[in-house]
Amino acid sequence: MNKFQIFFFCGIALLTTACAVQSSSESKTASTISAAPDSIIGSWTVRQIDSIALSDSTVPFPVIAFHDEGRVVANAGCNTLSGEYTYVAPALAFSDKLCQTLMLCPDEEITRNEQLLAQAMDSVLTVTSCGTDSLCMQGKHYMLLVKKHE
């Protein structure tokens, strides 16, 4: 076998494996999603935005806090987003303009997380329970939130 054939077959094997792993994780996610929760009030850590799994190894998880008077506050480690929200299960809508502090953040990962969070909060989201103390939010972007126990 020449080098081209070896690389070709390795590439095919890699793609086949990647597709199989993706399919099984999608079916698992679909089976664990249930109806919209009655309430989203409380503090939630953001564990995933779109396909990006967030880690708290170097920077803290972003946090979104929903208050019962329709106020929302979010922070990814530097700047704070705040505004109003309306939740009528399963639809979650944020006020047109969320306020954001404009501090210069020294960490690139925090800055990236803040940008992802602001983008994800810029649309109407459909909220579903996706496990014990977990919420899945889908709109223009996807977010996975886990209840923060204080």
Each model region followed by its residue ranges:
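Lipid interaction determinants
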Residues: 19-150
